[in-house]
Design a protein with these regions (language model features):
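C-terminal, surface-exposed recognition/capping segments
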Residues: 2-85
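Non-catalytic, polymerase-adjacent accessory regions of viral genome-replication enzymes
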Residues: 85-123, 486-494
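Short, conserved non-catalytic motifs in the polymerase core
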Residues: 104-108, 112, 137-161, 178-192, ...
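Amphipathic alpha-helical blocks
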Residues: 114-138
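Right-hand nucleic-acid polymerase module
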Residues: 155-156, 164, 287-289, 293-294, ...
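Active-site-proximal segment of RNA-dependent polymerases
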Residues: 171-231
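Conserved polymerase palm-domain catalytic core
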Residues: 210-346, 350-365
Length: 494
């Protein structure tokens, strides 16, 4: 089904978006009854001809009266379109993906802008999927400066719905891989995160060192420009091979087609900039899609990028685990005990074992495997030390059964708190409840990260400073774990 000369899918039988503006598709919007009449030869978009007494009714919602052929009424009733069961079933899955996409984003500007037109655009999106005409829309590119300079691409909201549609079908299969590998990866998974990653490394060190009584060696590796180095074609082929072998649900061909489109899409060739172009000067070449090698790179910011990258690294996880298990069996035949532990978070991974010579050889094998995958280890970010020296991982320094915040995290926390104090003092008469809630949520987020780490004295100092300066608005919990907004001030700011 193709668009006709007037931008209407399927010709005059389907009048889409009549009386509304839908900025997320390429349809030429018909803004009035007269426009609709002038752009067709028959003028028969309704149940009958224009002057027929059986014509479609326009409802005056202000008075409740119904006025036949009221051309000046803005509350236009769109004609109902009959769809087959296949279209309806697909539309329901798109609706499910849309609801999943809106979770946690209902207050964002993109979501609020999309909601009034969601039903119409999701209908159009369903048509595009049925007809095989879907293409990604324009993305928004911007730079995040905090905590470090990073390039981010925000996909159009309708494209995010497609991303969720894909992941809803593939995520359970990705989880099966993670479970089979022993849950060694902790990013982009429900129930996992930085906390479980730190606990995994801590338990691994404790196991390998026999409760800190034996010697062991730690290797920490980091990949160079991970997201911008991923070869698109290799990843796409791996995903399609995996789907063909493991996916047995509905819309398999459509899923394969969408994976090809999403993975091979180059958003930097069709994007809007929301940051000063001069800021890109300070961004490393291997951190930007605009300067990475052709056929490489995935946009940071998309749900599919995170999930697909995690799936891609599962191949590396499997290789490392296979090498460790093989050496364990070899040592067992020699009646020697070999202990090991492996954990990964995105592109950072840690291997702990009690055989230093084997670990050095394994690092070289990891280099070769990553080169085969189109990736590479960072030469200047290789950490090999005795386990009793501790290791820094995902913002936490893990040392002999204790966890400490990294200096960088402490510095960022102090910087934010002092910035909030200054802002509250300078805008005392202008501050709103929304801004106060944002300040509360940000500080509590940092305090939440402090849990499980030896941070009591630090929390007492930094929270004490904040409450001392801002006690008019906030108060703290007993153990400096949380700050709360004083309720008696809320009506004033509303």
């Amino acid at each position: 089904m193709k668009k006709d000369d007037y931008g209407i899918i399927g010709g005059s039988e389907l009048l889409i978006s009549y009386g509304r503006h839908t900025p997320w598709n390429n349809i030429n919007i018909l803004r009035s009854y007269e426009d609709a009449m002038s752009q067709t030869k028959t003028g028969n978009h309704w149940s009958s001809t224009e002057n027929s007494s059986n014509n479609a009714w326009n409802v005056n919602f202000n008075s409740g009266n119904t006025n036949n052929n009221n051309k000046n009424n803005n509350n236009v009733v769109r004609p109902a379109v009959a769809h087959d069961s296949e279209w309806t079933a697909l539309r329901e899955t798109i609706q499910t993906a849309y609801i999943d996409c809106c979770k946690g984003k209902s207050s964002s500007r993109q979501c609020l802008d999309y909601i009034p037109h969601a039903d119409e655009d999701l209908d159009v999106l369903t048509d595009e999927l049925m007809n095989g005409t879907y293409t990604p829309d324009t993305s928004t590119c911007f730079l995040v400066k905090y905590p470090k300079l990073r390039e981010v691409f925000a996909a159009a909201f309708r494209d995010r719905v497609i991303h969720h549609w894909i992941i809803l079908r593939l995520e359970p299969l990705f989880e099966q891989i993670c479970h089979k590998q022993g849950n060694v990866t902790h990013n982009c998974r429900k129930g996992f995160g930085t906390k479980t990653a730190v606990l995994s490394v801590q338990k691994g060190i404790k196991k390998v060192t026999n409760n800190y009584r034996c010697n062991a060696t730690i290797f920490k590796g980091d990949l160079v420009g991970f997201f911008m180095s991923i070869p698109q074609r290799r990843m796409c082929d791996k995903l399609k091979e995996f789907i063909n072998a493991q996916y047995h649900g509905d819309y398999k061909e459509m899923l394969l087609w969408l994976v090809e489109i999403v993975v091979m899409h180059r958003p930097e060739k069709n994007c809007m900039f929301n940051s000063n172009p001069e800021d890109w000067v300070g961004l490393q070449a291997n951190k930007s899609l605009f300067r990475c090698e052709e056929g490489r790179g995935m946009p940071i910011g998309n749900l599919t990028t995170q999930q697909f990258a995690n799936f891609y690294m599962a191949e590396f996880d499997g290789y490392v685990l296979q090498c460790l298990q093989a050496h364990k069996h070899q040592m067992r035949r020699q009646k020697k005990r070999f202990r090991w532990s492996y954990s990964r978070f995105v592109d950072d991974f840690i291997i702990v074992c009690n055989d230093k010579e084997f670990l050095m050889n394994l690092v070289n094998k990891c280099d070769e495997k990553l080169l085969e995958m189109g990736l590479s280890l960072h030469k200047h970010k290789r950490y090999i030390q005795p386990a009793n020296h501790g290791v820094m991982f995902v913002g936490t320094y893990i040392h002999n059964g204790r966890n400490y915040l990294s200096n960088r995290t402490i510095g960022r926390f102090e910087e934010r708190v002092h910035g909030f104090i200054k802002y509250l003092n300078e805008h005392e008469k202008e501050i709103t409840i929304t801004e106060l809630e944002h300040i509360r949520d940000t500080i509590n987020s940092y305090l939440g990260f402090c849990k499980g780490r030896q941070t009591y004295r630090f929390r007492k100092r930094i929270v004490g400073q904040f409450i001392l300066q801002c006690q008019k608005y906030f108060f703290r919990s007993a153990h400096y774990n949380k700050i709360k907004l004083r309720r008696k001030f809320r009506p004033i700011f509303k």
